[in-house]
Amino acid sequence: MDLYIYYRVQAADAALFLTKVSALQDNLSRLYAVRTALKRSPVAQDGMHTWMEVYLAVNEDFAVKLEQAVAASGLSSLIDGKRHTEQFLDLSLCV
């Protein structure tokens, strides 16, 4: 299963947020051997960018570990609103 998590962050906080979320993903990659990606919308709207964290081929328990790591990281203080999580299966592996 792959996780795609998106949310909005003030454009003015982009540099600080990038530092924090990159450290989070590096740590999760090291601890749980997951592949990660980080994306951001190219243009800010209303002073905000949409960001997306991607976690590929994770097991069902990873989501709990991820939320614990996010809570400990302080990311939530820089996010406007909620983190939205979508789960997807790679169908090329399921066929």
Language model: regions and residue ranges:
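A common structural junction motif
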Residues: 25-29, 70-79
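Conserved short beta-strand edge segments in small beta-sheet-based binding/regulatory domains
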Residues: 34, 73-89
